Amino acid sequence: MKKLSIFFWLVSFFLGTSIVVSQTSSFDIIIHSRIDTSKPEIKVIANLWIAYLNSTPDRLYDNPHWNLEEKNKYKYCDYFDFSIPHLYQFPSTQLLNYFKPTILSIEKEGDAYGIRTIFFADGLEGMYRKSNPWCIVKLYAIQENGNWKLKNSLPIITKDWEATTIGKITFRYPSSHKFNKKLAQKSIEFCNSITKEFQFPAWNPFDFYITESGDELGKLLNFDFSFGGYTTGMGLKKYGILLSGFGSEYYPHEFIHLLLPNFNRHSMIEEGFATWKGGQGGKSFQESAEILAQEFFKNDTVTFENILKKEWGWQHAAFYTLGAIICQKVYEKGGVNSVKKLLETPNSNDKLIENICSILEIKRNQIDNFCRTEVLKYRLK
């Protein structure tokens, strides 16, 4: 839900302004006067971080500024720096020319150094001023074979956390959190029941990191503060990690992302299925559908394409919820096998519409009326 509103803002900001985007990969990076670069070690770390920012960090390659252990651990994943997909929602060559980095502090923390950097834009006007700064990143520098390299915050922050393994899930949480064994067991039962109902392959073990808020979760993703990367939950299947900002051992929506078979499916179907079976934003599928139905009732011009392109309803999780309603309708029509066919929808808007129409036996020009009819069935009288 939150991610959709940020996406809308990003498109508006980068594509709707008259500012010309520079494509240079050399950025104006300020070192705050609090940082004493006369100290050789501090200067080396500052230069390391500056070099990394100028190395097109959003491009996946063997970046020499990052530690080898994490590069090897995540070599088959999409990125090794956990901040990448949230910080660079537009290419670094664009983003870093708007939100210019200022290194705020480089402080010794045990054997590592914590590096904090604010990404702030000059000269923003109107509504865009409310979205400044973009974020404050905090990650670490560690010694590796006599050289300083960058490292994610997650293993450093969580190294002294408690860990409880139940079934295939290892729950990791700070000592201040009171572990709820009943909810943990409920999580195992949920994962097993979904896998059985939809005949998914056996699910792999994963680590479930429990925090109390989106801000605390953000720290595990290298953010002291974030706008573009703010979230209260994330399932990272390739990494075997689930992150929660709800302070609970039970997070069915995110479990779904770790249970679904690997496939580059359309996000409306992936998020729709997760919302249908696991709710979203702390609301059940039924509650989300009722909210969307009320908004549909107030607007008789909204189309399927408006929601698909996130032009309408992002503040009501319309993209997620409409996907869930489609999943429910497909299930009513053809059961589990039809839902599994829907889950094989490729990541293409045209293929999405084609597959929905084929499974539900409707014509392409009927999809708007179909969606309106199905959504309004959830309206409270």
Show which residues each predicted segment covers:
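Juxtacatalytic substrate-recognition/specificity segment
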Residues: 161-266, 351-355
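Short, low-complexity N-terminal intrinsically disordered segments enriched in polar/charged residues
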Residues: 21-55
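Soluble non-cytosolic domains of exported or imported proteins
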Residues: 35-44, 177-189, 242-250, 264-268, ...
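Short solvent-exposed beta->alpha transition segments
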Residues: 30-33, 58-106, 217
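Surface-exposed, charged secondary-structure patches
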Residues: 80-128, 241-244, 252-255
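Short beta-strand edge/turn micro-motifs at domain boundaries
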Residues: 128-161
